[in-house]
């Protein structure tokens, strides 16, 4: 509904891509194996719903607007290995559908990408960055800190 509203609001608006960063909590559900089919159905419905805006879509068609599906932290893969392979594996090898998987779990050197664990997300006061180290239950994203990436870790992408 938001995408449609944005396209309706201004005919100069163009949908370039969809950035999809979801799936973590699907892994902890008993129904995790249904997620790949549900994702495909959602993708098809989204594209159908926006077909009236083809002229405002990258490539001239809602059917070819790229979906960029981002990875999650290593916590989820370590905790829910089978489920991770089912949910996140469904985003992989779908280039023919214009669905692209972006691995974020490790950096360019193969090291685990830092999470919101205080030891992995220190404050860098000289840079004006206050990470998980200075956060408490009043201002953190989740009490399960390794489930989210450090904000500093993903800069520059």
What do the predicted segments below correspond to?
Residues 1-157:
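Cell-envelope and extracellular/periplasmic
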């Amino acid at each position: 509904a938001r995408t449609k509203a944005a396209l309706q609001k201004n005919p100069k608006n163009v949908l370039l891509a969809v950035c999809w960063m979801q799936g973590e909590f699907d892994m902890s559900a008993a129904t995790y194996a249904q997620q790949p089919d549900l994702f495909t159905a959602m993708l098809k419905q989204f594209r159908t719903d926006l077909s009236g805006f083809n002229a405002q879509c990258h490539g001239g068609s809602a059917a070819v607007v790229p979906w960029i599906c981002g990875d999650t932290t290593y916590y989820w893969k370590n905790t829910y290995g089978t489920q991770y392979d089912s949910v996140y594996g469904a985003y992989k090898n779908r280039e023919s559908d214009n669905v692209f998987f972006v691995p974020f779990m490790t950096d360019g050197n193969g090291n685990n990408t830092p999470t919101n664990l205080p030891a992995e997300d220190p404050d860098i006061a000289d840079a004006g960055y206050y990470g998980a180290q200075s956060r408490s239950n009043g201002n953190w994203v989740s009490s399960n800190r390794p489930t989210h990436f450090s904000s500093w870790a993903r800069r520059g992408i």
